[in-house]
Amino acid sequence: MNILVIGSGGREHAIINSISKSNKCSKIFALPGNGGTELLAENLSGDVNDFELIKKISLKNKISLFFVGPEDPIVNGIYDFFKSDPQLKDINIIAPSKQAGLLEGSKDFAKDFMQKYNIPTAKHKTFSIENIDEADKFL
């Protein structure tokens, strides 16, 4: 099985390190990867938000499993992109949908979600430059 890991941080290195130990893994690709991932995977150059490039890489390298580490491509909808494309929909992708990614990508969305479902969290309120005086009072 060929695996693609998106990202360049410590999280992605840890994922690659773990999956490199599996006998089910034929080849690992990292986009863009880092110096540590280079020892375990083939680093590829490219932008983690260039979904068309990631599609080409996935098809060319017969990717079966795809991990997404960074928040940015998740919030930008990489899971939804893969699942809506007939050529990519059968690739297993480890990432939340764009909507679910908002829990990590938007603190305002996450706080509203927690309040709506009675999940314990610190008090919050959203402010803008127009209501800065309210922000001072809130604090």
Question: Residue ranges of each PLM-predicted region?
Answer:
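ATP-binding N-terminal substructure of ATP-dependent carboxylate-amine bond-forming enzymes
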Residues: 1-99
